[in-house]
Amino acid sequence: MASAQLPVRCSPDELRDAIRAVRLRTKLPFAVNVFAPLPSGEVEPDALQVARRELARYRERLHLPDPEPASPHGWTVEDQLAVVAQEKMPALSFTFGIPPLNGLDGIALMGTATTPEEAAALEHAGVDVVVVQGSEAGGHRGSFISSFDEGLAGLVALAGC
């Protein structure tokens, strides 16, 4: 099974287009991969202003421009998952958390774990495949329950998950 690694910031419409484009090129099954970040909560405007003010001196010293305020992209991982369900994808993989899995019946679900606790959470959520990510993988860590340091276990340590 191949895995279609579509962009994290892929809108639901772009995701649908990408799925259909892959289907035009192959009849083989493939998976969609999404990031499932934990909710970060709301940032108080006053706290944001304080942080911007504190960082301003560093931006001045380094001759960096004042960054544009972040703007939401107008869609959620739930919107992406609705497309996955509508398109009747055979498989879905995700990392950085456990997305809402309701409405994904019949889709093989694969989640990333960097610790035994995360593997247990994925199993409890009902995923079909737990993909353990040892520190040997390099790059970003798919941790979502554990601290960064706890997520640095090697693959051999995770083999019993």
What are these regions (language model features)?
Residues 1-161:
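Active-site entrance/lid segments in N-terminal catalytic domains of soluble metabolic enzymes
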